């Protein structure tokens, strides 16, 4: 499940496995005591919460922590500030490349996922029939460049998210520093969920409004009946101005609570499934096989993401009501109304596009990292969701 804040995407797994960066190495140096699965080494967030913090995204708990100060971000001790800054910026470029490459399918996912809210608000003429229909209509009505609408906010979100990862890291590591072999599986598992929820929510608190703005821009369709085909928002700043004017700060954080719950749900499913299935399937020659481990991680990531996808749908549907006359009273009210009026399948609209997005981004990021190795002599990961 967050652009989804944040859950590991396939592209982040690929870069984490095949192309481990200096950024990820520094982060792992500060990582929590519990060892993560091989396919989950990369600091990231699954697409639904991304960035994230949810496609955050959200950030893996063992990778979010703090320096001594909750305000200032300190570079790892063994690296000079200059090298750290270069890694940080290059990680941003890498994140921008992967996010921009996947932006068209990401917008299609959001359009399909939130189309019922757009129909109710009179901002969509008729429902989309599928991924191909959504692509075709969007290009026909708005032009091919519109497929990247909302991508700027998604790229910008990387930088505060990455800084917050360092800002919150050590604090939550000290609070939930349980070891699986010493404290037992269930205590480690509970600590992992708690640290993930606390760290994810803390980071998400600062970047959630960017995810909100990205969602509103991506779903600002030009083919609407309302407004004679004109867009509702003229850009990122306009989203903030109009939302604050109509709904205040609360409008920027609609769906925040259910987003935090989504972190716990996803992490519980991911780690629970991985720890349960890996000892059974990855035995013998498969135990040390990268491809077998990657395939298992890919299946579990998408399985956990699909199971937690309804949470992402509810939070984004709640986002879409900011500025509208009728709003959901709560996340439970949103869930109940969606199921009652549209059926349970409506909670999974856009899930297929969400999987395709991860596949599309994987090859692009791997290729980009290979280019970095040739040009710079080292690889930089995206570092964040």
Swiss-Prot record:
Signal peptide feature range: none
Gene3D superfamilies (alphabetical): Mitochondrial carrier domain
Protein's cellular compartments: Mitochondrion inner membrane
Activity modulation notes: The matrix-open state (m-state) is inhibited by the membrane-permeable bongkrekic acid (BKA). The cytoplasmic-open state (c-state) is inhibited by the membrane-impermeable toxic inhibitor carboxyatractyloside (CATR).
Catalytic reactions of this protein: ADP(in) + ATP(out) = ADP(out) + ATP(in)
InterPro entries for this protein: ADT_euk_type (IPR002113), Mit_carrier (IPR002067), Mitochondrial_sb/sol_carrier (IPR018108), Mt_carrier_dom_sf (IPR023395)
Domain of life assignment: Eukaryota
Repeat (Solcar) residue spans along the chain: 82-175, 187-280, 288-374
Residue ranges of the region described as Important for transport activity: 315-320
Transit peptide: 1-74
SUPFAM superfamilies to which the protein is assigned, alphabetical: Mitochondrial carrier (SSF103506)
Family in the record: Belongs to the mitochondrial carrier (TC 2.A.29) family.
UniProt protein name: ADP,ATP carrier protein 2, mitochondrial
Organism: Arabidopsis thaliana (Mouse-ear cress)
